[in-house]
């Protein structure tokens, strides 16, 4: 536009004057050109396109990170924690001073003209067209494809750099070191070509990427820098603090709500041991016990655990003579005894089998409930008989007893038979066991025993090993008479009473009826039959009622027929699913089979071999949204157990899980789970969080995930990509190690490992101050 103005003036001036102006302009342009050339030659690294180079660095970094994760996952050592902001600065500095990259770029610039540097190499033979200004008009189709595939890499390059404490660190307070050197160490390595790597991290053509046109970013920001800054802002907006609570490292939010407990009018029915969740889920992280170490592997953990992990000795002092637990140097040891089996649980287990062979451990009897479990040695040794025992006891009835059980690798939970139903469906347990469980079954119309009747499968057994069975004191005789009257009115048949001479105890074995004949022939309707409108499967926060649910006699419905023997039962499609529609829209039986095959494939081809999980450390597993229990079924041959959780707003598939010989529980993930901190080695969530975020605060849910997962434990999430992104930001803010990300068709997979990191600041939870 300026030259156009001068041309209009030229017609009014003399030719000599115009020549002078022309010479001045030419000289000026030459000087400017020389200055630009000298600047470019003297500092070649400054002319490198930061944006293009950043993208190249991103892809290289992600490739090397992915190779490290996929090939070297067996290593037990993981990168230390690293501050995210420092990470970005380091990356930028490395790019600007990388001699290899600088050399390649500079040599290319010296041999090409300015016009040639703006062109894109015709690597694929398609050619590039330019418009009148010399700019590229269209890119090759192959490069457009690479740019789309590269989007995931550019967004996750920073996040794929590990931010975890050392994987071999055993104590929480150790110093953290910066070990992030993956990109430099792996630069130039050849990517292994596998189907998974193509789906997750497409390789791209590095040579082609580095020859892209170098258009200086100047004062303009790049999308990569903007995205990195936004991610840092979002992550830093979550400022984690340690929970300052009376329970310290043993904090269970819904069981340590002292504000609610102090307001109770009565504790006669153990109301103070029931769940009282705070109005808002805590968003702080529970502290670690001083000297906490990684849990001992199963099966050694059944015999001993680290004292520093659960530094409680009261139970050893009170119950040591009954071989519950003893102190032994740096360990707490468990001789395998109990109040009713001082000489070992296995002898007691075999005694029960001999007393009534129809029990058939691990065949007919697969899933049992152990009430008032002590330290759960009974359930721990039933694994040797292929039996799953879910043990429960009130929190702190005996100091840390449930916590001991879980640390040993034995299924257990904090719960109480108080005023509400147990969080299980009706008619699911093959056997229920009570060994000196201190529950007054006979009082208040037998309300508590009737709750067991609800949970017990028709034809199932109730094993009562308590002093009224074999002692003749006045109190014991009175309880026995009351119990006999109640069980007869409930139509339970006393199958046998046997005495264990070695342990000097006895057991009475009852069986629940498989028909309603006895109920209909009773002379008195006491206890009364439940109303037809009373759903025996309704269990979440439902008050107890002293009534009997009729058993199902229709063979096409659940409960009328005993399940297949174990292990066939885990793969057998329940007959009663025939007339129902499945969760995924197909006929239920077809749905069940497809789900079973799907999880077998996922577990065998991905989880067991492709994620770098050391399964020898995995004992306590939770499926946070279980559906049919396919995930747990696929893991049945491993030496572990799975707590299957069916959220209260999901289809009620928990009875199907029990039918398969597995167990589980109902739960609302907007509240804390009734377990101690650091009790699970692996948490699995399949499309849980996308539904939770509609009604829960995900920060509170993730604080709960952190609470129940052990340091160095694994967290696997499958969900839509938006939700995966949110979860990834949160785990990164807690310094967890992102081990793997995968995306396809809008769905994502995230695998992370919890670190040892704890915040330095504290947050007082007023409801948890005693």
Curated annotation (Swiss-Prot):
GO terms for molecular function: methyltransferase activity. Residues 39-770 are lumenal. One of its GO terms (cellular component) is nucleus. Keywords: Glycoprotein, Golgi apparatus, Membrane, Methyltransferase, Signal-anchor, Transferase, Transmembrane, Transmembrane helix. Its EC number is 2.1.1.-. It is an enzyme of class 2 (transferase). SUPFAM superfamilies: S-adenosyl-L-methionine-dependent methyltransferases. Glycans are attached at residues 160, 166, 244, 363. It is a single-pass type II membrane protein. Residues 54-81, 93-164 have a biased composition (Basic and acidic residues). InterPro entries: Put_SAM_MeTrfase (IPR004159), SAM-dependent_MTases_sf (IPR029063). One of its GO terms (biological process) is methylation. Pfam families: Methyltransf_29. The keyword Membrane applies. The chain crosses the membrane at residues 18-38. It comes from the Eukaryota. Residues 212-223 have a biased composition (Polar residues). Residues 1-17 are cytoplasmic. It is found in: Golgi apparatus membrane. Residues 54-223 are annotated as: Disordered. Belongs to the methyltransferase superfamily. This is Probable methyltransferase PMT24.
């Amino acid at each position: 536009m300026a030259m156009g103005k001068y041309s209009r003036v030229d017609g009014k001036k003399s030719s000599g004057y115009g020549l002078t102006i022309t010479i001045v302009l030419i000289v000026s342009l030459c000087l400017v050109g020389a200055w630009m050339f000298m600047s470019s030659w003297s500092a070649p690294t400054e002319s490198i396109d930061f944006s293009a180079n950043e993208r190249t660095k991103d892809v290289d970094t992600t490739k090397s990170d992915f190779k490290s994760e996929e090939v070297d996952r067996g290593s037990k050592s993981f990168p230390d924690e690293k501050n995210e902001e420092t990470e970005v600065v380091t990356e930028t500095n490395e790019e600007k001073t990388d001699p290899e990259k600088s050399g390649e770029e500079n040599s290319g610039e010296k041999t090409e003209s300015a016009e040639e540097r703006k062109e894109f190499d015709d690597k694929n033979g398609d050619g590039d067209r330019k418009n009148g200004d010399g700019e590229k008009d269209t890119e090759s189709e192959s490069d457009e494809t690479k740019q789309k595939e590269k989007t995931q890499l550019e967004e996750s390059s920073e996040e794929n750099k590990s931010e975890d404490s050392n994987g071999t660190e055993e104590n929480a307070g150790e110093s953290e070191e910066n070990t992030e050197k993956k990109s430099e160490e792996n630069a130039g390595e050849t990517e292994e070509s596998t189907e998974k790597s193509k789906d997750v991290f497409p390789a791209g053509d590095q040579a082609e990427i580095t020859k892209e046109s170098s258009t200086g970013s100047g004062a303009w920001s790049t999308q990569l820098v903007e995205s990195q800054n936004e991610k840092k802002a979002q992550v830093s907006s979550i400022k984690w603090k340690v929970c300052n609570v009376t329970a310290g490292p043993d904090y269970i939010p819904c069981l340590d709500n002292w504000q609610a407990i102090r307001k109770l009018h009565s504790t006669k029915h153990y109301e103070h041991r029931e769940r009282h969740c705070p109005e808002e889920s805590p968003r702080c992280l529970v502290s670690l016990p001083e000297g906490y170490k990684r849990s001992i592997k199963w099966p050694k953990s059944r015999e001993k655990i680290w004292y520093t992990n659960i530094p409680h000795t009261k139970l050893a002092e009170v119950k040591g003579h009954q071989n519950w637990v003893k102190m032994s140097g740096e360990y707490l040891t468990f001789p395998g005894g109990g109040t009713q089996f001082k000489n070992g649980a296995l002898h007691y287990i075999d005694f029960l089998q001999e007393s009534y062979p129809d029990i058939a451990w691990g065949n007919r009897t697969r899933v049992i409930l152990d009430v008032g479990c002590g330290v759960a040695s009974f359930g721990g040794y039933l694994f040797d008989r292929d039996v799953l025992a879910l043990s429960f006891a009130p929190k702190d009835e005996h100091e840390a007893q449930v916590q001991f059980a879980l640390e040993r690798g034995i299924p257990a939970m904090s719960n109480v038979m108080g005023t509400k139903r147990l969080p299980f469906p009706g008619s699911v347990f093959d056997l229920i066991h009570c060994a000196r469980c201190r529950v007054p079954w006979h009082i208040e119309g037998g309300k508590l025993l009737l709750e067991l009747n609800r949970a017990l499968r028709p034809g199932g057994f109730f094993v009562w090993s308590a002093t009224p069975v074999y002692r003749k004191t006045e109190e014991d005789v009175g309880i026995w008479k009351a119990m006999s009257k109640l069980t007869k009115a409930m139509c339970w048949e006393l199958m046998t009473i046997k005495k264990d001479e070695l342990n000097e105890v006895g057991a009475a074995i009852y069986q629940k009826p498989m028909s309603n004949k006895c109920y209909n022939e009773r002379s008195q309707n006491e206890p009364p039959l439940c109303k037809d409108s009373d759903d025996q499967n309704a269990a979440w926060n439902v008050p107890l009622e002293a009534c009997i649910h009729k058993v199902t006699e229709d063979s096409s419905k659940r409960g009328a027929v005993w399940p297949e023997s174990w292990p066939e039962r885990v793969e057998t499609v329940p007959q009663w699913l025939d007339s129902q529609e499945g969760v995924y829209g197909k006929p239920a039986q077809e749905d069940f089979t497809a789900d079973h095959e799907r999880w077998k494939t996922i577990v065998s081809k991905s989880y067991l071999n492709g994620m770098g999980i050391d399964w020898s450390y995995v004992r306590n597993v939770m499926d946070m949204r279980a559906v049919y229990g396919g995930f747990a079924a696929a893991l049945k041959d491993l030496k572990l157990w799975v707590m299957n959780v069916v959220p209260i707003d999901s289809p009620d598939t928990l009875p199907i899980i029990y039918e398969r010989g597995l167990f589980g529980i109902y739960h609302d993930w907007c509240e804390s789970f009734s377990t101690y901190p650091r009790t699970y080695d692996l948490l699995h969530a399949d499309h849980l969080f996308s539904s939770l975020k509609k009604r829960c605060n995900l920060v509170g849910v993730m604080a709960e995930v952190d609470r129940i997962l052990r340091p160095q434990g694994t967290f696997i999430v499958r969900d839509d990509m938006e939700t995966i992104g949110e979860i990834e930001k949160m785990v990164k803010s807690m310094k967890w190690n992102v081990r793997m990300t995968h995306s396809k068709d809008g769905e994502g997979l995230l695998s992370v490992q919890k670190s040892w990191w704890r915040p330095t600041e504290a947050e007082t939870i007023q409801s948890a101050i005693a």
